[in-house]
Amino acid sequence: MEKIKVMLDTSAYSAFLRGNAEVNQALQAAEEIYLNPVVLGELYAGFAQGGREKKNKEILREFLASPRVQIAVIDEETAERYAAILTYLWSKGTPIPTNDLWIASTAMQHGLKLITTDGHYRDVPQIIVECCGV
């Protein structure tokens, strides 16, 4: 049986913290959970703007310490996939935010199911998207 590998975007991580049942179920079923540097950057920026920065960083550190959680690398192959997705979405008139392109490209590159609460990822070809709470 193939391992269940998922990637969280920022919205899914936030939903997880809020106790979203669909996201929690997806994470419980996953053997490997990935985030990428873009997601981490968005989280850290959000923490800095909120009133619980220290506590939120501590919670994230605990999450990242799990042996099931890994950081997916962004490299030249990711950039090529980014360009292909962006070109496709432009041609369809359905662009998505730049950071979300990087997240989708990373999921595509590593064959990861993308867990999100953002429905616009459904417009991205060649990735499996599980939209929770959309």
Walk through the language-model features, giving the residues of each.
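Short, hinge-like loop/turn segments at secondary-structure boundaries
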Residues: 50-54, 89-90, 131-134
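A general structural signal for well-ordered alpha-helical segments in protein cores
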Residues: 40, 57-60, 79, 100
